[in-house]
């Protein structure tokens, strides 16, 4: 038998015989609850006295907990989201996942006695000495000449050296920090008061993470479609948390008695010590106990993010994913705690924490949300809002405006600080002139880096990698409705593909392997952008192909990798192959999903192809014009002008298709030609792409002719200072094609007719000696054969003579 109870939530509770609760004073909302065992239903309605923290009402908020008389049947009801929106008895974020059946199925699994987890944690180091690598600069501290001040004291130049400027915490947060009532998202704990600073929600269609950050208390809830929900709570020491059921029972912290400055609580599914989920929970908790230094903790979060990207099993991915989220969570809490303890924080840290948050969330969306990465979202309540955000944008505009007008040059580190500030404030995603100016500055910086890379004078250091990421993000995150957004994005993708040469790919893979070895040895601080490469922003899709053995000649090997492999020598080649595989996983998972990028910036490719076949066969996509793109693939089948590339391995064929709307198919012909020298100041080759491939069907590079200077180097051929344009220094044999923006492709004869073969004297001497020896062997062999034939002939004649004598 089912019992239906009609409940109305208002401010004052009156209980009627029909189990109808009427709380007059607010607009009523009716919710029909389906309960079993109606005779045993009872209502526990408590009001909170402000002086008594054990009761539940505060500032017109009433918490209603409904249970049954039978202790084994207690449940907390989770209602449809439409009904939750009508409930006014407490304030909480609306979440389609946190109100799903996950909680109904899992939150009450097992006995309450098993909800407390115990583990041995290493001793807490209150003064952890962490080396801090801050983009090759020294982090300053406030002095008498440079004391912490309010936001109003900021100047435009401060954003070019943010580590020198310090802001008062009280000025930064102001009224945004408020006394609030903490309502456990899992509805398992008695609500308590705390000083709320910010709320962060992010996830995708199949996952949601909710973080509530305070000064002395913070909580994080992970809810997914296919795994039980988990909640972590960090609280000031000696502040007890109580369970709703059994009533008032104290909930034990996991790390009680370890000497750490905060207690850690865990809510989740746990049956017994052999439960596989328990190991995952313990790893999360251990990641929270190392230190309360923000820079150390966020470095651990970045390192765990790389481990997540390197995983190839879903089980390992989920464990690594939880560890990433846990470390990000405790990093944010440490930043807030330290800022309030010291009373100030640097402008650099304010910007860095927002940038790190967005960066890790985007990394998670690519590595962990791959199936629904396009649905990922981030809702971040930040103290930098309203008038403070307007002030910062105004100051940034004063810095960016002269740079976008090419009247003020900046160094790479200044570009990094400026573009990171725009990224942290989410300016690229906003409409208006400021995002356009940021995009202009970013594109100019990318073009300068591209020019240096083509001349082999670029140092791929930490500053360059980080600045390039923020530059590409400033362009690729702009709304497509904004003026010039699509044009700049297509140009940026071409520049990224141009820098993604075969030598660069293998050097990047080795750098990632070295970084992974350092992560496993707990060496220097790690940042996710330390592995960034323009290949991640390009549409070159063959990064995982093992065909670059000949490119290794120009790559410097890393001693850390050699030492690591030497220690693991008993495992043979397995460990080396494992490192290579992990590097390829990281490159593959951290790049933006192909279909999402194409739908935004090269929709003609999707319109003229089958998406499934495109993802399987395409190895390079070049959006060479505003209306057309080249697709290099292993198989034909796309609609457009289809070119068959001759002179390659039949088992590794290459097809090039020029796609544009409307999607019509024709057969193209690649014509060999000699490039003519343009007259005057014209630039007929600007916008073209030099595509070089090897005889085994592998793409070596696709150089984008982005300026008249590069055109001059291209037509200089043997006199070119750019080695990829010089046939005498192009190294490996192969063919070179020039792809025009209008869909025409020609083969450049200069790279075929001017090959230079260099034969060493040692090789010649060895060849001559070998020839002499071979000739001697042949002569001796022939003489032996002749002698043997003579002997046999004479013996045969003697036999004939004897036979004749017998007959006679």
From Swiss-Prot:
List of glycosylated residues: 44, 60, 114, 240, 272, 431, 461, 719, 742
Origin: domain of life: Viruses
Keyword match Transmembrane helix: yes
Chief localization: virion
Transmembrane segments: 762-782
Post-translational modification: N-glycosylated, O-glycosylated, and sialylated.
Keywords from the named record: Fusion of virus membrane with host cell membrane, Fusion of virus membrane with host membrane, Glycoprotein, Host cell membrane, Host endosome, Host membrane, Membrane, Sialic acid, Signal, Transmembrane, Transmembrane helix, Viral envelope protein, Viral penetration into host cytoplasm, Virion, Virus entry into host cell
GO biological process: fusion of virus membrane with host plasma membrane; symbiont entry into host cell
Virion surface side: 18-761
Topological domains annotated Intravirion: 783-808
GO cellular component: host cell endosome membrane; host cell plasma membrane; membrane; viral envelope; virion membrane
Cell compartments where the protein resides: Virion membrane; Host cell membrane; Host endosome membrane
UniProt feature coiled coil, ranges: none
Signal peptide positions (record): 1-17
Membrane disposition: Single-pass type I membrane protein
Region (Interaction with gL): 205-266
Record has Transmembrane helix as a keyword: yes
Subunit structure as annotated in this protein's UniProt entry: Interacts with glycoprotein L (gL); this interaction is necessary for the correct processing and cell surface expression of gH. The heterodimer gH/gL seems to interact with gB trimers during fusion.
Protein task: The heterodimer glycoprotein H-glycoprotein L is required for the fusion of viral and plasma membranes leading to virus entry into the host cell. Following initial binding to host receptor, membrane fusion is mediated by the fusion machinery composed of gB and the heterodimer gH/gL. May also be involved in the fusion between the virion envelope and the outer nuclear membrane during virion morphogenesis.
Family membership: Belongs to the herpesviridae glycoprotein H family.
Name of the protein this chain belongs to: Envelope glycoprotein H
């Amino acid at each position: 038998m089912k019992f239906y109870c009609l409940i109305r939530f208002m401010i004052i509770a009156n209980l009627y015989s029909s189990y109808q609760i009427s709380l007059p004073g607010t607009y009523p909302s009716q919710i029909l609850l389906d309960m079993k065992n109606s005779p045993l239903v009872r209502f526990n309605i408590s009001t909170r006295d402000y002086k008594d923290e054990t009761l539940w009402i505060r500032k017109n908020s009433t918490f209603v907990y409904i249970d049954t008389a039978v202790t084994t049947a207690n449940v907390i009801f989770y209602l449809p989201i439409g009904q939750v929106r009508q409930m006014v008895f407490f304030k909480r974020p609306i979440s389609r996942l946190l109100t799903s059946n996950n909680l109904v199925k899992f939150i009450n699994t097992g006995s309450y006695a098993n909800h407390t987890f115990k583990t041995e944690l290493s001793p807490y180091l209150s003064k952890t000495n962490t080396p801090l690598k801050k983009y090759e600069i020294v982090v300053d501290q406030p002095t008498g000449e440079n004391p912490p001040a309010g936001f109003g004291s900021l100047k435009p130049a401060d954003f070019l050296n943010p580590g020198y400027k310090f802001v008062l915490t009280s000025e930064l947060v102001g009224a945004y920090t408020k006394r609030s009532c903490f309502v456990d998202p899992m509805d398992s704990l008695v609500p308590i008061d705390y000083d709320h600073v910010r709320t962060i929600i992010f996830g995708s269609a199949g996952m949601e993470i909710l973080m509530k950050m305070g000064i002395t208390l913070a909580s994080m809830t992970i809810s997914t479609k296919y795994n039980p929900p988990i909640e972590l709570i960090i609280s000031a020491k000696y502040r007890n948390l109580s369970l709703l059921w059994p009533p008032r029972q104290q909930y034990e912290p996991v790390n009680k008695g370890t000497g750490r400055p905060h207690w850690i609580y865990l809510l989740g599914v746990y049956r017994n010590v052999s439960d596989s989920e328990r190991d995952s929970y313990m790893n999360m908790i251990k990641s929270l106990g190392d230190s309360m230094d923000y820079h150390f903790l966020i470095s651990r979060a970045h390192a765990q993010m790389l481990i997540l990207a390197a995983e190839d099993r879903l089980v390992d991915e989920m464990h690594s994913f939880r560890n990433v989220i846990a470390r990000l969570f405790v990093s944010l809490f440490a930043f807030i705690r330290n800022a309030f303890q010291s009373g100030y924080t640097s402008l650099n840290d304010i910007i860095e924490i927002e940038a790190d948050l967005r960066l890790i969330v985007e990394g998670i969306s690519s590595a962990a949300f791959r199936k629904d990465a396009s649905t990922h979202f981030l809702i971040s309540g930040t103290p930098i809002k309203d008038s403070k955000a307007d002030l910062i944008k105004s100051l940034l505009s004063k810095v960016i405006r002269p740079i976008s007008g090419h009247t003020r040059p900046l160094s790479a580190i200044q570009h990094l600080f400026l573009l990171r500030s725009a990224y942290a404030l989410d300016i690229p995603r906003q409409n208006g002139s400021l995002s356009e100016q940021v995009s202009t500055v970013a594109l100019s910086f990318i073009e300068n880096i591209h020019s240096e890379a083509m001349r082999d004078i670029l140092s791929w250091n930490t500053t360059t990698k980080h600045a390039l990421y923020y530059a590409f993000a400033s362009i690729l995150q702009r709304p497509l409705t904004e003026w010039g957004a699509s044009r700049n994005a297509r140009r940026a993708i071409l520049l990224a593909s141009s820098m993604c040469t075969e030598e660069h790919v293998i050097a990047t893979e080795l750098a990632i392997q070295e970084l992974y070895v350092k992560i496993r040895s707990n060496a220097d601080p790690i940042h996710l952008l330390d592995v960034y490469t323009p290949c991640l922003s390009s549409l070159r899709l063959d990064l995982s192909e093992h065909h670059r053995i000949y490119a290794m000649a120009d790559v410097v090997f890393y001693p850390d990798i050699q030492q690591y492999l030497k220690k693991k020598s008993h495992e043979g080649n397995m460990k080396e192959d494992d490192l290579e595989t992990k590097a390829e996983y990281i490159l593959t998972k951290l790049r933006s999903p192909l279909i999402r990028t194409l739908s935004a910036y090269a929709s003609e490719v999707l319109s003229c192809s089958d998406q499934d076949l495109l993802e399987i066969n395409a190895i390079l996509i070049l959006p060479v014009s505003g209306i057309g793109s080249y697709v290099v693939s292993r198989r034909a089948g796309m609609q457009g002008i289809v070119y068959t590339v001759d002179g390659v391995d039949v088992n590794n064929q290459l097809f090039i298709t020029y796609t544009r709307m409307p999607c019509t198919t024709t057969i193209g012909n690649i014509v060999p030609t000699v490039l003519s020298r343009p007259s005057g100041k014209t630039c007929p080759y600007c916008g073209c792409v030099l595509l070089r491939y090897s005889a085994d069907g592998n793409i070596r590079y696709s150089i984008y002719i982005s300026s008249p200077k590069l055109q001059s180097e291209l037509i200089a051929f043997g006199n070119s200072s750019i080695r990829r344009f010089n046939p005498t220094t192009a190294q490996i044999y192969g063919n070179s094609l020039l792809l025009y923006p209008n869909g025409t492709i020609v083969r450049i004869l200069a790279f075929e007719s001017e090959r230079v073969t260099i034969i060493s004297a040692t090789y010649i001497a060895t060849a001559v000696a070998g020839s002499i020896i071979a000739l001697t062997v042949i002569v001796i062999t022939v003489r032996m054969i002749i002698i043997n034939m003579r002997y046999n002939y004479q013996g045969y004649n003697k036999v004939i003579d004897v036979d004749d004598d017998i007959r006679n």
